[in-house]
Amino acid sequence: MAAVWREGDDLLLRLYIQPKASRDSIVGLHGEELKVAITAPPIDGKANAHLSKYLAKLCKVAKGSVVVEKGELGRHKQVRILQPSQIPAEIAALIE
């Protein structure tokens, strides 16, 4: 299964999250997932909130348009971005 795909106007991402990183970044493929490093710690939902904010900024959408569909409490997540205005090059290159 792909790490990144389109479903209608939405963008779906299968992610592996690295919390408490030195900076926010899209690292690249990690097996069949896209590895994303974020600075927030994995405590009390801070990592999910930070991930949503980071992806919203990259795709030029509101934070509410980034939905964690699976993996709320783990490092492996599936995220839906509703009607992204922009898709970063490192993500666009992986769309199947």
Swiss-Prot record:
Record-linked SUPFAM superfamilies: YggU-like
Positions of disulphide bridges: none
Gene3D superfamilies: YggU-like
Entries under InterPro entries matching the protein: DUF167 (IPR003746), YggU-like_sf (IPR036591)
GO terms under cellular component: cytoplasm
PANTHER family: UPF0235 PROTEIN C15ORF40
NCBIfam families tied to this protein: DUF167 family protein, PRK05090.1
Similarity comment: family membership: Belongs to the UPF0235 family.
Protein name per UniProt: UPF0235 protein VCM66_0443
